[in-house]
Amino acid sequence: MAGGDREKALDAALANIEKQFGKGSVMRLGDEVRAPLEIIPSGSIALDVALGLGGFPRGRVVEIYGPESSGKTTVALHAVANAQRAGGIVAFIDAEHALDPDYAKNLGVDTDALLVSQPDSGEQALEIADMLIRSGALDLIVIDSVAALVPRAEIEGEMGDSHVGLQARLMSQALRKMTGALNNSKTTMIFINQLREKIGVMFGSPETTTGGKALKFYASVRLDVRRIETLKDGTDMVGNRTRVKVVKNKVAPPFKQAEFDIMYGKGISREGGLIDVGVEAGLVRKAGAWYTYEGDQLGQGKENARAFLRDNPDLANELEKKILEKLGVGPTVDQDVAELPAEPIGVGDF
């Protein structure tokens, strides 16, 4: 077929597709500049920098996993609070039946406006999530956790019954349905997941996440959260030092790390993160135990500097803005990549 005939045939095919499926069903990527990805701040400037965009991407699936008490739910609740501050509507699907409203309120969550569901089964949880996504009204949905999404057949069965692959098939089916709807509605979906160990692994890490391989494929961002140190004030334990590895990122360069402090009862220390990242970026000067910013002494020792920034929110906001500008953090048009998995998911993946 000659070049001109091929173009005519393609134009006719595109016209038929648009007539049948609507305008924009098929388009050339170069025809129109895509808008930058919208984001929901994570609550930690170090994590925002590691994510490359300044937060969690809108319209995508995010998986947060790690050992028990590592800070997974805390990170998710900070995202909830930030989405609400921007005027967004958020749902929290509490499959573990373990949400602490008082702790969530301490982190800045508007618990009165938060939609909460405590489903009876995995099918019910994912069906509720799907209906909320398709309403187009939600900005963020958190599911805590994948391990607690127990299939109905397992709940109704006997204790010793075998249910191989049931949960993996449930997750695979749900994610196939929801991924496109998430992108259309610009709803971010955060799955909190637990770690398990494979038996008989001789080489490599024996750790794996629950729920099969589908979530690994469909997630645009995967975060590995670990507690690395206990923070003390004298002999009192006041918090944890947490490290987050971005093990997968389809919207910015992956494999970056972030460290931040989680204070007991208060959540992620925003001011501590500003000090740490400010020192790394060269905006905050550390001389001995003293921290200074543009000639202003923030305090002697990190705790005093943290308190100074807490008492001076305008200065903290200015420092945050300068850090993000200097590090070039923010959504860009050409960082977005394909949304679908690079390889198909087969029966052997369950």
UniProtKB/Swiss-Prot annotation:
One of its GO terms (molecular function) is ATP-dependent DNA damage sensor activity. The keyword DNA-binding applies. One of its GO terms (biological process) is DNA repair. It holds the Pfam family RecA. The keyword Ribonucleoprotein does not apply. Its main location: cytoplasm. Keywords: ATP-binding, Cytoplasm, DNA damage, DNA recombination, DNA repair, DNA-binding, Nucleotide-binding, SOS response. It comes from the Bacteria. SUPFAM superfamilies: P-loop containing nucleoside triphosphate hydrolases, RecA protein, C-terminal domain. One of its GO terms (cellular component) is cytosol. Can catalyze the hydrolysis of ATP in the presence of single-stranded DNA, the ATP-dependent uptake of single-stranded DNA by duplex DNA, and the ATP-dependent hybridization of homologous single-stranded DNAs. It interacts with LexA causing its activation and leading to its autocatalytic cleavage. NCBIfam families: tigrfam_recA (TIGR02012). This is Protein RecA. It comes from Nocardioides sp. (strain ATCC BAA-499 / JS614). The gene is recA.
